[in-house]
């Protein structure tokens, strides 16, 4: 008797830029990797605008980013999700966490946390929360933000690029904020709710977000959500060798370039940065043609792990 095989669910990837500045080559690398890794498996590729941090959003930048993607030859599936319109969904998730005892109000200021912290931290500006409000707000304290209770056990997962991961959240960050003192929902909660709502199964993004992944996995588990597969691609370094910033205008995609004409060249450079070997005959090809090649030939195992500069020409 022949037993029919169970159909595999479709791969759903996404690219989620923040409209706080124009796309730069670091954004391009993440977009190419997420696009190729979804399309190579016949999957969907979604675009989401992470415009949650409204004070930092540049007016008109979301549309500028979409135009840039179109000029480069990207095509996406479905409507654009915008985080700025999803406060109700984030609020519902927060209420679920509070009702289950997984989250709590916090009345601490940053200065109070810094004074109370006794554990050493890694110097990146983040101090593990010293649990001042974990058992309830002290007398006279008003809630400023909301935090999630992180588990004592480490969070482990395997990243498709960076390999096995082991993160001790209590030592790394402690109970982290999921709704900020300014009333905005935190990125960690919003992205988890959005990935679940869109059915995202594969998250491909820059290595600067690797430390966010264990936090998001904790939230997924507490909310009963599925955990996507993660792949964190190496960062593009700026002129000084550090992480590329949106302030590095020389590496902006739109800086003095005709993207319709030069898009293919930039995409080929992004593919080479990602360890791929596009054929010589693609030199001078359109962006759409280069992306078609990437969709059929991208090899995730070739992606390097180390940050490196971006070279637009071979």
From Swiss-Prot:
Task: Write out the entry's keywords from A to Z.
Answer: Aminoacyl-tRNA synthetase, ATP-binding, Ligase, Metal-binding, Nucleotide-binding, Zinc
Any one GO CC term of the record: cytosol
Q: Is this entry keyworded Transmembrane?
A: no
Q: Could you say which cofactors this protein requires?
A: Zn(2+)
Q: Which cysteines are joined by disulfide bonds?
A: none
Co-factor remark: Binds 1 zinc ion per subunit.
A Gene Ontology MF term for this entry?
Answer: glutamate-tRNA ligase activity
Q: Which GO terms describe its biological process?
A: glutamyl-tRNA aminoacylation; tRNA modification
Q: Where does L-glutamate bind?
A: 14-18, 50, 187, 205
User: InterPro entries from the xrefs?
Assistant: Glu-Q_tRNA(Asp)_Synthase, Glu/Gln-tRNA-synth, Glu/Gln-tRNA-synth_Ib_cat-dom, GluQ/Sye, Rossmann-like_a/b/a_fold
Residues that, per the record, bind Zn(2+) = 106, 108, 129, 133
User: Which positions does UniProt annotate for ATP binding?
Assistant: 246
Family in the record: Belongs to the class-I aminoacyl-tRNA synthetase family. GluQ subfamily.
Q: What does this protein do?
A: Catalyzes the tRNA-independent activation of glutamate in presence of ATP and the subsequent transfer of glutamate onto a tRNA(Asp). Glutamate is transferred on the 2-amino-5-(4,5-dihydroxy-2-cyclopenten-1-yl) moiety of the queuosine in the wobble position of the QUC anticodon.
Q: State the protein's name.
A: Glutamyl-Q tRNA(Asp) synthetase
| Species name | Geobacter sulfurreducens (strain ATCC 51573 / DSM 12127 / PCA)
Name the gene that codes for it. Answer: gluQ
